[in-house]
Amino acid sequence: MIPIVRLATIEDADVLSRLNYEFNGGDKRPEAEIIGSLNTGNELVAVAELRDEVVGFACAQSSQSFCYAASHGEITEMYVQESARRKGAAAALLAFLEAQLRLRGVGTVKILTGRTNDPAIATYASCGYVKHDEAVLEKRL
């Protein structure tokens, strides 16, 4: 079965809350906050369906800098529930978000993932992403 990918709607808030909890742990995000985020329109949120069930999601953002001619994109989140993995959902989510980012004028897309997340790295590589040796630094404010 081929996954169906579409932009998330406010009707997906409940399943997005559940999937995000499976992915990130911590406290479940309230549906009202998810709906508010979906309504701002700043972030692309896509969902993948198999047999009419949402089984995964991915998020992307684009930004523009005077330093570069084209906008840059980033896939900021990607999760497919375990029972739906290896069925093409992640690749379909990537292709969908790449097309949406192209419409926004994005010329390059990056994805950050854990250094030892070999299944994700293999998926991204199979979709044409190239691994770079960069350091990620973070600071709490």
Regions found by a protein language model. Give the residues of each.
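Acetyl-CoA-dependent GNAT
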Residues: 3, 7-70, 76, 94-96, ...
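Hydrophobic adenine-recognition pocket in adenosine-nucleotide-binding enzymes
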Residues: 8, 78-80, 113
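Residue-level recognition of the GNAT/N-acetyltransferase active site
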Residues: 63, 81, 85, 114
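Loop/helix-junction capping segments adjacent to catalytic residues or to phosphate/diphosphate-binding pockets
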Residues: 69, 87, 118
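Conserved acetyl-CoA pyrophosphate-binding loop and the N-cap/start of the following alpha-helix
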Residues: 84, 88-96
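Conserved active-site alpha-helix within GNAT-family acetyltransferase domains
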Residues: 91, 115-133, 139
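Conserved GNAT acetyl-CoA-binding A-motif
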Residues: 102-113
